[in-house]
Amino acid sequence: MAGKKVLIVYAHQEPRSFNGSLKNVAVDELSRQGCTVTVSDLYAMNFEPRATKKDITGALSNPEVFHYGVETHEAYKQRSLASDITDEQKKVQEADLVIFQFPLYWFSVPAILKGWMDRVLCQGFAFDIPGFYDSGLLQGKLALLSVTTGGTAEMYTKTGVNGDFRYFLWPLQHGTLHFCGFKVLAPQISFAPEIASEEERKGMVAAWSQRLQTIWKEEPIPCTAHWYFRQ
């Protein structure tokens, strides 16, 4: 939709990967719609995933005992966070939709993306106490996980060896994104592209492109435990 701003947080080492193809088609389709699309290519940026004292450029509020959450909250208020953090926060703040494109690592995100979440979504910027879930500081924004897996779709069912895929979405979609106030759109799951045929992979890319054509008309998922753990 013309005038909308989209941030794609991309976490894959190889530009020619299937994840890279999904990222590229998202950029192309959303740009075609007139959206302004920004990509944070975390590996290409050599993004620092570790949460350390270096994230605070000013004086610590308690130099005797370091508490990362407390210190980054204070640093956010004092405008003394490291520039790589504030650069990403500005991108998030300007975005109407944030898409996270990544391969599933151990039922979660790659370490570099976890580090992005740990460092960028700090108290004062993404949430406060009070000021979380429906009152999160990023309310009014949309978020979407676009994930590739190593396992097949059958493996991620209630009766499959891995269990229902929605179980693994709970800490990411609910405990992180919804906690920060995002309205979460249904995830885009591309199952087992490594073992899929070329035709099947093309179908996955086409399905993602087609979905993006009407992405602004989608309703967010219900932010309830039942959506994830329904019986």
Swiss-Prot record:
Listed cofactors: Zn(2+); FAD
Binding site for Zn(2+): 174, 178, 223
Keywords from the named record: Cytoplasm, FAD, Flavoprotein, Metal-binding, Oxidoreductase, Phosphoprotein, Zinc
InterPro entries named in the record: Flavodoxin_fold, Flavoprotein-like_sf, NAD(P)H_dehydrogenase_qn
Modified sites of kind Phosphoserine: 80, 197
Top-level taxon in the UniProt lineage: Eukaryota
Positions that bind substrate: 127-129
GO MF terms held by the record: dihydronicotinamide riboside quinone reductase activity; metal ion binding; NAD(P)H dehydrogenase (quinone) activity
GO cellular component, one term: cytosol
EC number: 1.10.5.1
Transmembrane segments: none
Pfam families: Flavodoxin_2
Annotated residues for binding of FAD: 12, 18-21, 104-107, 148-151, 156, 194, 201
Intracellular or extracellular location(s): Cytoplasm
Cited function: The enzyme apparently serves as a quinone reductase in connection with conjugation reactions of hydroquinones involved in detoxification pathways as well as in biosynthetic processes such as the vitamin K-dependent gamma-carboxylation of glutamate residues in prothrombin synthesis.
Family listed: Belongs to the NAD(P)H dehydrogenase (quinone) family.
More details: Uses dihydronicotinamide riboside (NRH) rather than NAD(P)H as an electron donor.
Name of the protein this chain belongs to: Ribosyldihydronicotinamide dehydrogenase [quinone]
Gene source species: Pongo abelii (Sumatran orangutan)
